[in-house]
UniProtKB/Swiss-Prot annotation:
Reaction catalysis annotation: O-phospho-L-seryl-[protein] + H2O = L-seryl-[protein] + phosphate; O-phospho-L-threonyl-[protein] + H2O = L-threonyl-[protein] + phosphate; L-seryl-[protein] + ATP = O-phospho-L-seryl-[protein] + ADP + H(+); L-threonyl-[protein] + ATP = O-phospho-L-threonyl-[protein] + ADP + H(+)
Domain STAS: 546-653
Residue stretches making up the PPM-type phosphatase domain: 177-396
Organism of derivation: Mycobacterium tuberculosis (strain CDC 1551 / Oshkosh)
Amino acids binding Mn(2+) 2: 211-212
Post-translational modification as stated in the protein's UniProt record: Autophosphorylated.
Job description of the protein: Primarily acts as an independent SigF regulator that is sensitive to the osmosensory signal, mediating the cross talk of PknD with the SigF regulon. Possesses both phosphatase and kinase activities. The kinase domain functions as a classic anti-sigma factor-like kinase to phosphorylate the anti-anti-sigma factor domain at the canonical regulatory site, and the phosphatase domain antagonizes this activity.
Cofactor: Mg(2+); Mn(2+)
Name this polypeptide is given: Multidomain regulatory protein MT1410
Keyword Protein biosynthesis: no
Key word Disulfide bond present: no
């Protein structure tokens, strides 16, 4: 019988141990039992969560928001298996101190705590809050992104080539929401053979995920040829079976393409029928509107060159149903048997779809974006990954009705149209950059129509219409009943607005007639696919709350502008710049970070200010972060613009 340990002699006196535990600067937590009740916390933990009475409470009751973020699943695994686990820069969202839910990042180690007989009584954690480190890196990455051309030149050429060969975006269509993520393997950042595609064809949407055997530049070259061949067949109107048969014949001319796998699916927008073929590829995961998840039946088709043919199966997708295509890197993860890994993928996707899992602060995002990004992040961060991972997700939705606005040709018409158009474009799922471009073009059209209306009769009004077609194009028009108004040659800003509108959208036309003027635009909508090298940490995109009311704050040598700068507010800004700069004699900085719309009249005022400063030998510095409406427009008209730190843009608000 083993002698009982002399704790005081072996470990130290209880009071000394407690005092040392208390003063260790790292967060230390002891949990007990299968419900992970808090039994010990040190001063560092209490300083981290000062208002929470945790000792004696189950962890899930103290931090309920963490349910579904995979931290409790990790604690369960350590308690059940006795195997230590760790996490690096895990993003966790919960109420840490009673002040509301917030997002922080952590490094941690979880280890089992055993009784004298070897059985596990609980787990303990060593935790380091690394939020400051992560956010500093995010800020640095944002600055690198601002210098994107220089950054691209120093990146690995194979990675650059692969991203150039992959689909950079997914379409926006009336009957479905789509999202895509591509994760580059941490230990092999060279190009690989994974790819995805989404093609909007009017009456149907075709989704593709494929995987070529091998890695590196050779695999990427094979992938690009197969992707192009399949796109050509699908775009030409061939069925899933016909397209795959053609690619199977073509692959014989492409060394290294044998045994490539593909999953191709076609959604009929009207009926919801989803026809698919799993050509040697893992079957898609179907997540229904009521948040149940199951894998669809494989079709029995083999990879390219297998000679099995390409039989198809069909599912009917209801409104709210989602389908997830993926490559094997998602389910073949280190330390997980394939059966357990596939079940974990389905369970996690179902919990995120139901709202019980995932990140609570991500809720404002589109459901399909949360399903795609949260699933990828939460699934992989506890195991890591050895291969590139592609995840392409689509959720069927009811189409948004077309937009129709009729209003009088008054000075506030453009502002009214911008507000309604922004809301409609956001509802159909347009990306913020497309929203800015279309809103800008239509606003210029409306302002021209107002001038026509003032020349005749305001009550004749303006009609604005917009609709999203099944091919992913928005078609919009502005119709007025006024007469075209000529402008004096050389008048500042005249003619610039229509030229800018034509440059911002895919196609624009203006037709004049005796009964008025019709301005139309066509613009293909897309949302960027997300390419990442680290699933733990996502880079924050530029975001701004839409407050279109024009406000300008004048400080010493600095003007901060917010809201819409259009034909009704540009004159105010012009006067403020002239006064603050003393007509160009004094240097001035104009912060346009919070500008929601920069029309041609505003561009004219800024161009004039820069011209005055240049003539006087001083500076007029325009500030706007990359991705903002002002930065986009100023880059288009080639006015020099300086980026800003997006974390500080709204600090004073």
């Amino acid at each position: 019988m083993a002698a009982e340990m002399d704790w005081d002699k072996t470990v130290g006196a209880a009071e000394d141990v407690r005092r040392i535990f208390e003063h260790i600067p790292a967060i230390l937590v002891g949990l007990e039992g299968p419900d992970h009740r808090f039994v010990a916390v040190n001063a560092a933990y209490r300083g981290f969560s000062p208002l929470l009475d945790t000792v004696g409470q189950p962890a899930r009751e103290v931090y309920p928001e963490l349910e579904g973020q995979q931290i409790y699943e990790m604690l369960d695994r350590v308690y059940q298996t006795g195997e230590p686990q760790s996490g690096s820069e895990w993003r966790l969202q919960t109420d840490y101190d009673g002040s509301g839910v917030e997002e922080r990042y952590f490094d941690f180690v979880v280890t089992p705590r055993r009784r004298a007989d070897g059985s596990i009584e609980g787990v303990q954690l060593i935790v380091d809050d690394v939020t400051s480190r992560v956010r500093a890196r995010q800020a640095a990455e944002a600055r690198v992104e601002e210098l994107s051309e220089r950054y691209r030149n120093v990146r690995d050429s194979a990675t650059v080539m692969q991203q150039a060969l992959l689909a950079a975006s997914v379409p926006v269509v009336p009957g479905a929401d789509i999202a895509a993520e591509y994760l580059v393997a941490a230990e092999d950042t060279a190009a690989g053979g994974d790819w995805f595609d989404a093609l909007a064809l009017g009456d149907r949407l075709v989704l593709v995920v494929g995987d070529v055997v091998g890695h590196g530049v050779e695999a990427a070259a094979v992938m690009s040829q197969l992707r192009t061949a399949l796109r050509m067949q699908i775009s030409a109107g061939y069925t899933v079976v016909e397209a795959l048969e053609a690619v199977d014949r073509f692959h014989k001319q492409v060394p290294g393409s044998k045994s490539a796998t593909m999953c191709v699916g076609s959604l009929d927008f009207t009926s919801g029928e989803f026809q698919y073929c799993t050509a040697g590829h893992p079957p898609p995961l179907l997540v229904t509107a009521d948040a149940s998840a199951r894998y669809v039946e494989p079709t029995g088709a083999g990879p390219l060159g297998s000679g099995t043919g390409f039989p198809v199966r069909s599912e009917v997708l209801n409104i709210g149903d989602a389908i997830l295509f993926y490559t094997d890197g998602l389910i073949e993860r280190p330390g997980r048997p394939l059966e357990a890994s596939t079940a974990e993928f389905a369970d996690l996707a179902a919990s995120i779809a139901s709202g019980s899992g995932g990140f609570v602060l991500d809720a404002p995002a589109r459901p399909i974006d949360r399903l795609c990004s949260d699933t990828l992040e939460l699934l992989l961060r506890s195991t890591g990954y050895n291969d590139d991972v592609t995840l392409l997700a689509m959720q069927r939705r009811a189409p948004t009705p077309p937009l129709h606005i009729t209003l009088d040709a008054t000075i506030n018409a453009a502002r009214t149209v911008r507000a309604q158009l922004r809301e409609w474009l956001a509802e159909i799922g347009a990306d913020h950059s497309d929203i800015a471009d279309i809103v800008h073009a239509i606003s210029e059209f409306v302002e021209n129509a107002v001038e026509h209306g003032y020349a005749t009769d305001v009550s004749k009004g303006i009609v604005v219409e917009a609709a999203l077609a099944g091919d992913g194009n928005v078609r919009a028009s502005v119709i007025d009943r006024g007469q075209w108004k000529d402008h004096r040659d050389g008048a500042r800003g005249r003619g610039r607005g229509l030229a800018m509108a034509e440059a911002l959208v895919s196609e624009a036309r203006i037709m004049h007639g005796a009964g008025g003027t019709t301005a139309t635009l066509t613009h293909r909508l897309s949302r960027p696919a997300r390419f990442v090298t680290d699933t733990m940490v996502r880079r924050a995109a530029f975001q701004q709350t839409i407050d279109s009311e024009f406000v300008s704050l004048v400080e010493s040598g600095r003007i901060v502008v917010r809201g819409d700068v259009d034909s009704t507010t540009a004159a105010t800004l012009d006067r403020q710049i002239a006064v603050e700069s003393r007509s160009g004699i004094a240097p001035v900085t104009i912060d346009l970070s919070a500008v929601t719309h920069l029309g041609s009249a505003g561009v004219g005022a800024l161009a004039a200010a820069c011209d005055r400063a240049r003539k006087q030998g001083t500076e007029c510095v325009l500030v706007a972060p990359p991705g903002s409406p002002a930065h986009h427009v100023l880059s288009l008209v080639q006015l020099p613009v300086v980026g800003a730190d997006t974390e500080d843009i709204f600090a004073q608000e």
